[in-house]
Amino acid sequence: MSSAKLGSASEDVSRRDANYHPTVWGDFFLTHSSNFLENNDSILEKHEELKQEVRNLLVVETSDLPSKIQLTDEIIRLGVGYHFETEIKAQLEKLHDHQLHLNFDLLTTSVWFRLLRGHGFSIPSDVFKRFKNTKGEFETEDARTLWCLYEATHLRVDGEDILEEAIQFSRKRLEALLPKLSFPLSECVRDALHIPYHRNVQRLAARQYIPQYDAEQTKIESLSLFAKIDFNMLQALHQSELREASRWWKEFDFPSKLPYARDRIAEGYYWMMGAHFEPKFSLSRKFLNRIVGITSLIDDTYDVYGTLEEVTLFTEAVERWDIEAVKDIPKYMQVIYIGMLGIFEDFKDNLINARGKDYCIDYAIEVFKEIVRSYQREAEYFHTGYVPSYDEYMENSIISGGYKMFIILMLIGRGEFELKETLDWASTIPEMVKASSLIARYIDDLQTYKAEEERGETVSAVRCYMREFGVSEEQACKKMREMIEIEWKRLNKTTLEADEISSSVVIPSLNFTRVLEVMYDKGDGYSDSQGVTKDRIAALLRHAIEI
């Protein structure tokens, strides 16, 4: 606890301090820019030429279906599938024939199954039955086949016992074989055992796979070169977006005005880029990056620094959504409030009204108000000593985790669909959004509850579960990990059942969940971004791929 002075905050109030480290980037992204495309029209020409070559490879008719399946998968894993969405969809529709697999080996069946399920095609898991021996066991010691099988099992849904058996079998065999493998297969297996492709941030997975594919003897030179050039071109765009966000962050001077809060504008951009990296969503990323930044400041204010009286005043001001309300909140909070209103005004002017869908701003503001209300409830838990039931805690946490808000704002930002009906549906927290939100909450709480307890908080999913069901801390944590798997199966199931309306929510739900899996895989990688998070951001946003 510390007694702090900040703006007009009460001087005698005892306040908590989370001791968040300063930004690990300094002003690097404020000034850094790629020179990859500078005065180099030949790169753009080469990129276009290679893109056409890859397209031709993808669409050419062939009777060699295993090779076509492998090529389609490689294009997607290398991060260039967004160039060929129409062609890939057409190929997958041709491959969606349940009888095709009868001629495939286990490796090809695994890739085929993962590709089709990953794109919403319903494929029964019993396609793997014919690969079991008379004892009902899988039989293969081929590492590449085991890797492909292991990756496929992560698209399982509840009740698929054969995939439960397959994941145990393939993981055990791969762990035993890994020390004997050589690059690049060794790295493919190591990456999969750490974070399977289906649960990985797709941009990060591409960054990992590009050098692995480049080292394969069977690589297609034009595809390998195209993936490298495309990565560097996209990186230049992403750097320019982060540079713009860094300028906005610095202009408001949030780090010095709010020293108790996390200074994480680069980490926030990494979060939003992980959710949708494609060039056509540039404006959406810019808006959502600012939303992550301002939401993080509000979260830290409610969670760490503000008194109950102060945060209640801020909540009331958010409900009013009026610049005149700024005079009714503590001075140190005013920069947050002004920044918040400015973000949504820019969003309305530059993204929503430009598309003639001005009704979207009401959804955006309401979902933001909703998350502030959830922060208010959590502040009341701490300041009043109230201990909610497990269900009550989880109901609020589905909102405070932010994923409902981010999914809805991403839908608005992408603007690809008949939005009003989709937004109405997503606002009800359907199974797809709920599963994504619950995974986020379980992962977050497992990695943060001990640090939060050190600063006086006693309410978390772990502690609420322990208290309500009379189990040990170890048992509660085990239950949370089991629930993550259950919710992943539910999320997989909802993507397979998606209709015209819900299909637009599939990608946001999956991608935001993937970002959480990666951000928190070795701890709270957002609050403490000095280790693996920094390395991943550097790989995606600092270091170009050598060509």
Curated annotation (Swiss-Prot):
Entry superkingdom: Eukaryota
InterPro entries in the cross-refs: Isoprenoid_synthase_dom_sf, Terpene_cyclase-like_1_C, Terpene_cyclase_plant_C1, Terpene_synth_N, Terpene_synth_N_sf, Terpene_synthase-like, Terpene_synthase_metal-bd, Terpenoid_cyclase/PrenylTrfase
Cysteines joined through disulfide linkages: none
Pathway(s) of this molecule: Secondary metabolite biosynthesis; terpenoid biosynthesis
Residues involved in Mg(2+) 2 binding: 299, 303
A GO term for molecular function: magnesium ion binding
EC code(s) of this entry: 4.2.3.87, 4.2.3.93
Cofactor mode of binding and number, as noted: Binds 3 Mg(2+) ions per subunit.
Residues engaged in binding Mg(2+) 1: 299, 303
Keyword field: Lyase, Magnesium, Metal-binding
Motif mapping: DDXXD motif: 299-303
Family: Belongs to the terpene synthase family.
Protein name: Delta-guaiene synthase 2
Native species: Aquilaria crassna (Eagle wood)
Record lineage: Eukaryota, Viridiplantae, Streptophyta, Embryophyta, Tracheophyta
Gene name of this polypeptide: C3
